């Protein structure tokens, strides 16, 4: 599994990064097979490091909601200002967008 990281800093809900990492990077088949286990693993590590145990169903809802943000972040790299250089190969961006939108359809995000 690889991850495209833009090296930017922002403040937001933990599920934003998790949704991006899982939906943009994994093939749809792998995501379908692993996403719940990956989220459980993330929540276990979160609890171990913070002492806060998060509810899985609520966390899964947050994960689904943040797929929209993942789509936005990928779309920006495809439709950036002409004043900026290409951020990544168009093929990479289109693959990530296809994966994210497939996840959104699978999980009825919209």
Regions found by a protein language model. Name each.
Residues 8-50, 67-88:
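Active-site activation/catalytic loop segments of kinase-like enzymes and analogous catalytic loops
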Residues 50-51, 108:
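Glycine-centered secondary-structure boundary/capping sites
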Residues 2-5:
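Pre-DFG segment of protein kinase catalytic domains
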Residues 57-110:
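Regulatory N- and C-terminal appendages and interdomain linkers associated
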Residues 52, 56:
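Short, charged, surface-exposed loops that flank catalytic or proteolytic processing sites
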